[in-house]
């Protein structure tokens, strides 16, 4: 009897020891854009716990943040990101064009691989001293604007395209008048930072400018961290549906053997837990149950999509942001 128990105990110890031996310590690198720092600081430990409970493997996720365009360039230049979570599809397309990501990447996850969305709003100082109410308020004489540089920042490109969409609607789809409106707006930009978080810091911490054109999530974060006694959010009548996108970096995950966990990391963003974390960090979730739960956090406004107004990112980039494009033309002083 005791001999049998001894054999059984030995077998259990051996099984436990083998599980310890087989458990892995995995590292992932998520190269992301500027304002997602807080989101992934909260999401990463939740995913790590989920993955360890599911597989026994421990995972450490490292983060890199910066302007979305600059981050894409860093991956193109050799930074070994397992996943990219960038501000817009064009930046991931740029990596795919160099062969590191499958060109059909956008079809691999739901909602065109955009697990959460945002839009573009205005952050103003308490009392709204310049009386900013909509896009046309931004071109009033004496209004100093802070927005990042579309050459380096994904959020800045969304800002620019949101302004252009308003210009079209306000001028009966007249593209020349829309161009004149956006030109007038950029003539009043005081600082063009390289990324969205830098622009927020310029406005919030350095006290420069009357209005910050910002991601909605970034504006809400500023309000909730610094207080409604310092800043207010102005939601314009119309803005763009901003869709930050995500992908595994195929070349890297196949080299490092991390495809399974990298894919699971992105898929978990669509889970109820992932969607809840997105909403808590002021991103608009996709899950309808979570949308309903947080409906009071996100004002209703008219939203247009990139495809409805600009065709696709390739067209928008070529016309507006490429060297010699419309942005270069209108930003000359």
Model-derived segments and spans:
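N-terminal segment of the mature folded domain
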Residues: 24-153, 295, 302
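A bilobed periplasmic-binding-protein/Venus flytrap-type ligand-binding module shared by bacterial periplasmic
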Residues: 120-128, 243-260, 277-281
């Amino acid at each position: 009897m005791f001999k049998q128990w001894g054999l059984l105990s030995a077998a259990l110890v051996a099984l436990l020891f083998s599980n310890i031996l087989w458990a892995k310590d995995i590292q992932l690198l998520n190269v992301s854009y500027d304002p997602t720092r807080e989101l992934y600081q909260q999401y990463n430990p939740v995913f790590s716990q989920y993955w360890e409970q599911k597989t026994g493997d421990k995972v450490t996720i490292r983060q890199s943040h910066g302007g979305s365009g600059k981050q894409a360039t860093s991956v193109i230049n050799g930074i070994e990101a397992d996943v990219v979570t960038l501000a817009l599809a064009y930046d991931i397309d740029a990596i795919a064009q160099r062969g590191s990501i499958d060109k059909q990447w956008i079809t691999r996850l739901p909602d065109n691989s955009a697990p959460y969305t945002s839009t573009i709003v205005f952050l103003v100082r308490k009392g709204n001293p310049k009386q900013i109410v909509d896009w046309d308020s931004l071109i009033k004489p004496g209004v100093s604007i802070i927005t990042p540089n579309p050459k380096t920042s994904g959020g800045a490109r969304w800002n620019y395209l949101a302004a252009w969409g308003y210009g079209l609607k306000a001028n009966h789809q007249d593209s020349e008048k829309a161009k004149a409106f956006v030109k007038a707006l950029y003539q009043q930009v005081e600082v063009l930072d390289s990324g969205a978080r830098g622009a927020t810091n310029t406005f919030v911490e350095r006290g420069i400018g009357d209005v910050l054109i910002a991601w909605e999530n970034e504006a809400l974060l500023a309000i909730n961290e610094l207080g409604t006694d310092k800043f207010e959010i102005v939601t314009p009548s119309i803005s763009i549906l901003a869709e930050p996108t995500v992908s595994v970096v195929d070349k890297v995950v196949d080299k490092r053997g991390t495809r399974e966990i990298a894919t699971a990391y992105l898929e978990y963003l669509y889970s109820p837990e992932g969607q809840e974390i997105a909403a808590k960090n002021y991103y608009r979730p996709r899950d309808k149950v979570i949308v309903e739960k947080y409906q009071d956090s996100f004002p209703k406004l008219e939203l247009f999509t990139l495809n409805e107004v600009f065709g696709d990112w390739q067209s928008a980039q070529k016309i507006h942001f490429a060297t010699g494009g419309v942005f270069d033309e209108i930003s000359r002083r």
